Amino acid sequence: MGQKVHPNGMRLGIIKSWNSIWFASKKEFSNYLDSDFKVRSYVKKKLIKASVSKVIIERLSKNIRVTIYTARPGIVIGKKGEDVEKLRIEIAKITGVPAQVNISEIRKPELDAKLVADNISSQLERRVMFRRAIKRSVQNAMRQGAKGIKIEVSGRLGGVEIARREWYREGRVPLHTLRANIEYNTSEAHTTYGIIGVKVWIFKGEILDGMLVVSNKKDKKPFISVKKVSQKYRK
């Protein structure tokens, strides 16, 4: 039975970067990892209504820089920047080093896999029909310029006794193409019947910058080996 590799982990170092950017020795590695987990858990719990997509953590020599990607930056910043200052102080307490918090706005939340998954799960918790929620999210993503999108929900859909899995796809989602910019994320809907899992794949296009170019030493010209299939037609 075929299994699917994680689309983000497969493309790390090729077209995608890490969410935690730092280097640590063997002694400090576990402490840094635990600290990052606590910071992300606190941010997502504190900003549950701010539509937070991801949290990037960078550790410099003696301080930490946290970048929060959100579709509602006004909720994160607060009145005259009071909320973001409280957030910075709390993160500094968790990590034990001076913290810097940056806010990055997501212009098109319809093309962010995490926000799409959270939107569908919130609709399922409000007892919206799952097919209607999926089709609405697919139409919004394609309207905003997505090349393809796939959404999968699994669990006791519609309150039935036997759990099942359903998915809907529009456009193309090339999972094996490394240069394909595919966003993948998940979410959970806590309903009265149980937990319903939501998975979202969004294909935004291909990234060709930074790809490996093979060069011929004799000709000193870069080339890409492509097999041309010649077809002969008989009259």
Swiss-Prot record:
Q: Which CDD domains match?
A: KH-II_30S_S3
Q: Which keywords belong to this entry?
A: Ribonucleoprotein, Ribosomal protein, RNA-binding, rRNA-binding
Which example biological process does GO assign this protein? translation
Query: Which intervals hold domain KH type-2?
Result: 39-107
Keyword Transmembrane helix among UniProt keywords: no
Write out the GO cellular component annotations: cytosolic small ribosomal subunit
Entry-linked SUPFAM superfamilies: Prokaryotic type KH domain (KH-domain type II), Ribosomal protein S3 C-terminal domain
Protein's UniProt keywords contain RNA-binding:
yes
Q: Which domain of life is it from?
A: Bacteria
Q: A single Pfam family, by name? A: KH_2
Q: What does this protein do?
A: Binds the lower part of the 30S subunit head. Binds mRNA in the 70S ribosome, positioning it for translation.
Q: Which family does it belong to?
A: Belongs to the universal ribosomal protein uS3 family.
Q: Quaternary arrangement and interactors, per the entry?
A: Part of the 30S ribosomal subunit. Forms a tight complex with proteins S10 and S14.
Q: What's the name of the protein?
A: Small ribosomal subunit protein uS3
Q: Which organism is it from?
A: Buchnera aphidicola subsp. Cinara cedri (strain Cc)
Chain's gene name: rpsC
